[in-house]
Amino acid sequence: MPNRRASRNAYYFFVQEKIPELRRRGLPVARVADAIPYCSADWALLREDEKEKYSEMAREWRAAQGKDSGPSEKQKLVSTPLRRPGMLVPKPSISPPDMSNLSIKSDQALLGGIFYFLNIFSHGELPPHCEQRFLPCEIGCVKYSLQEGIMADFHSFIHPGEIPRGFRFHCQAASDSSHKIPISNFEFGHDQATVLQNLYKFIHPNPGNWPPIYCKSDDRARVNWCLKRMERASEIRQDLELLTVEDLVVGIYQQKFLKEPSKTWVRSLLDVAMWDYSSNTRCKWHEENDILFCALAVCKKIAYCISNSLATLFGIQLTGAHVPLQDYEASNSVTPKMVVLDAGRYQKLRVESPGFCHFNSYNQEQRSNTSTGYYPSGVKISGPHSSVRGRGITRLLESISNSSNNIHRFSSCETSLSPYTPQKDGYKPFSSFS
């Protein structure tokens, strides 16, 4: 990874060739490093003879740079770092860009740093050949700091504009399966120019440098495209720096612990359903209609996840601005509840297990003190006769087994049937056959 710029390999030239195609698809690829995540799958599908073309390009480039000159392979390996030792240093882009932008010098500076989390929803995603890839319909943004939690939030619905011909059903289906915002005649929608102006006022109310904006890496292409589209519609030009939340979390961990966590762990940290239905998380319209997908909720849940994971590491007392306290306290409490999928099997294991011997005598005592009948689990009914039952399928199998056993005993018995004796499970055996 650190030597990628120093030694361009076949994959580098393959990615470089794919950049124009990625830009036509609306992806934010300004350089090769940005395009690498989008090309790995296509590279894996190439045959060896197809990859040879790019390997040849890499060899020609190294020859032009003078890296292939020399009498032996050993001299080539030694001469490269001696000639350009600076290339062995990792690229600045590997560390999250927010760390340099904020000029973090201490934990106190990190705690006081202001972060903006942004998300924009769309009525689906149109095919790559369409000029309009997304139709923005909702925007949410929160102002956050580790010290104060969520300080302010911004939310608005957006008029998506004219639906491209032939894609109305596609857009309606995408809306119905997620945020359920109407694709037309929505009374709460605002024009894109007004929404963008209000967003800029929220993010940058005072003169000075514009703060960086963060969103999830999976949403970055859509959010960036929608911002550019809204800028063209409103004729307002502001080059917002759109970064990823994953890089922000990695940077905070690096600053605090001098270690870099894996991106997989960071994504699992942010993708939780703990606060999906928490109060004051979704916008008013989605809350009233009981709809889970909301752009504002995505931003707030990012803040909740960061607070839950990072704020305590800095000794910060969590408040209602950091996480929904009622849900946070409930999640940390232990509920004495157990779900048993096969009650009959579980009861059998408990009786046979030596660790539950004292429960065995207790259960027998309870059987003699409870009445016959079916009652919900956990309900105790006093009565003369009762038996502990399993699930319905368990009782059915037991009855079939008992019936077959009784028939077998009847056919093989030469003497008269013994007097009726109640069975342990409450079922009567066959006493006569017609």
Curated annotation (Swiss-Prot):
Its main location: cytoplasm. One of its GO terms (molecular function) is DNA binding. Residues 4-73 bind DNA. Pfam families: HMG_box_2, Maelstrom. The keyword DNA-binding applies. It is found in: Cytoplasm; Nucleus. Testis-specific. Present in spermatocytes and round and early elongating spermatids. GO terms for biological process: apoptotic process; cell morphogenesis; DNA damage response; ectopic germ cell programmed cell death; fertilization; gene expression; homologous chromosome pairing at meiosis; intrinsic apoptotic signaling pathway in response to DNA damage. Disruption phenotype: Mice are viable but show profound defect in synapsis of homologous chromosomes in male meiosis, piRNA production defects, DNA demethylation of LINE-1 (L1) transposable elements and a 100-fold increase in L1 expression in the adult testis. In the adult testes, L1 transposon derepression occurs at the onset of meiosis. As a result, spermatocytes are flooded with L1 ribonucleoproteins (RNPs) that accumulates in large cytoplasmic enclaves and nuclei. Spermatocytes with nuclear L1 RNPs exhibit massive DNA damage and severe chromosome asynapsis. It comes from the Eukaryota. Keywords: Cytoplasm, Developmental protein, Differentiation, DNA-binding, Meiosis, Nucleus, RNA-binding, RNA-mediated gene silencing, Spermatogenesis. GO terms for cellular component: autosome; chromatin; chromatoid body; cytoplasm; cytosol; male germ cell nucleus; nucleoplasm; P granule. Interacts with SMARCB1, SIN3B and DDX4. Interacts with piRNA-associated proteins TDRD1, PIWIL1 and PIWIL2. Interacts with Tex19.1 and, probably, Tex19.2. Belongs to the maelstrom family. Plays a central role during spermatogenesis by repressing transposable elements and preventing their mobilization, which is essential for the germline integrity. Acts via the piRNA metabolic process, which mediates the repression of transposable elements during meiosis by forming complexes composed of piRNAs and Piwi proteins and governs the methylation and subsequent repression of transposons. Its association with piP-bodies suggests a participation in the secondary piRNAs metabolic process. Required for the localization of germ-cell factors to the meiotic nuage. This is Protein maelstrom homolog. It comes from Mus musculus. The lineage of its organism: Eukaryota, Metazoa, Chordata, Craniata, Vertebrata. The gene is Mael.
